Amino acid sequence: MSVATLSAPEKTRVIVGMSGGVDSSVSALLLLEQGYQVEGLFMKNWEEDDGTEYCTAKEDLADAQAVCDRIGIKLHTANFAAEYWDNVFEHFLAEYKAGRTPNPDILCNREIKFKAFLDYALMLGADLIATGHYVRRRDRDGRSELLKGLDPNKDQSYFLHAVGGEQLAKTLFPVGELEKPEVRAIAEKHSLATAKKKDSTGICFIGERRFSDFLKQYLPAQPGNIEAVDGEVIGRHHGLMYHTIGQRQGLGIGGLKDASDEPWYVLSKDLQRNVLIVGQGNDHPWLFSRALLASEIYWVNPVDLSAPLKLTAKVRYRQSDQACTLEQTSDGYRAVFEVPQRAVTPGQSVVFYDGEVCLGGGVIEQAEPWFEGRA
């Protein structure tokens, strides 16, 4: 059972990270009902240009304030834009510049929500923080474990894998025991302003604009050739950073002589030559990997890898658990899968599980092909 469901001492002060969404709104309400001293905090992590219509921060703040007014709690505001730029966004740009595909949400959780926000809340006198993430915390053997959320469609442990046990010990996850429809029902029952608000999608600082339009504001495009597996040049790309492994849309390839009607997919990036390598078919052999190498591993709690471990892993959000064997090598960590994995993407995260416990994860450095002969 999660500590978030236990009765709370009335003297425990909790500050809830209020995003202006339904999950954090209901989190604050549930904690209030459980007897905690509850306050909210809205964090601004991105400084948009004057007049922009992309960022929803103003609307989100208004929604968070409306919810806090409704349930009768104070709302603090904090600006972590400088920390976000230094610790999340610059890394995001560097990864794209290097031809990789990063996941800024994971860094944002580690550096902002469970570091900058946690530190700020403690400075305000909080005993604990809370968020609206769909995960659970279990305290066992003197340490706090990260468990999957009970709603398999909303479990967010993949995004929180880099948060340490010490930070988890100071955090409550009130909706981790619930399914999304239950959360919305609670919000509607209490007439919260966010009850029917759509879930946010995409990267927070990009909003609704096209990703390529956003990226070229910060990084110069480097056009190059698109090649088939046999080396034939069949097109041009605007920049490797705009493409990811397994991508189908936006390649601009079609009507080639002697080619089948099957769609084209990004198979690989040749960073040395600035070449995008593509092939036809959703199950093209080049799309599959039997193993991967990972670095920058963060464990929620220490893990003994003196011998290989049989675990499960996800190489992308909402993927089903994939059986693998993990071992530590001189180059980092190597995960070998029982079933070849499609579109293993350098820069993305691989996250490891032991049953419902999220152990941690790292950044995918390299995918190993599942057959001989691939470049």
Curated annotation (Swiss-Prot):
Compartment list: Cytoplasm
Major location category of this protein: cytoplasm
Gene3D superfamilies: Adenine nucleotide alpha hydrolases-like domains, HUPs, Translation factors
Biological processes, Gene Ontology terms: tRNA wobble position uridine thiolation
Transmembrane feature ranges: none
GO CC entries: cytoplasm
Listed SUPFAM superfamilies: Adenine nucleotide alpha hydrolases-like
InterPro entries the record matches: MnmA-like (IPR004506), MnmA-like_C (IPR046885), MnmA-like_central (IPR046884), MnmA-like_central_sf (IPR023382), Rossmann-like_a/b/a_fold (IPR014729)
Sequence segments annotated as region (Interaction with target base in tRNA): 103-105
Entry EC number(s): 2.8.1.13
Residue numbers binding ATP: G17, M18, S19, G20, G21, V22, D23, S24, M43, G132
Active-site annotation: C108 (nucleophile), C204 (cysteine persulfide intermediate)
Keyword tags: ATP-binding, Cytoplasm, Disulfide bond, Nucleotide-binding, RNA-binding, Transferase, tRNA processing, tRNA-binding
Protein function: Catalyzes the 2-thiolation of uridine at the wobble position (U34) of tRNA, leading to the formation of s(2)U34.
Family matches, as PANTHER family: MITOCHONDRIAL TRNA-SPECIFIC 2-THIOURIDYLASE 1 (PTHR11933:SF5), TRNA 5-METHYLAMINOMETHYL-2-THIOURIDYLATE -METHYLTRANSFERASE (PTHR11933)
Protein name: tRNA-specific 2-thiouridylase MnmA
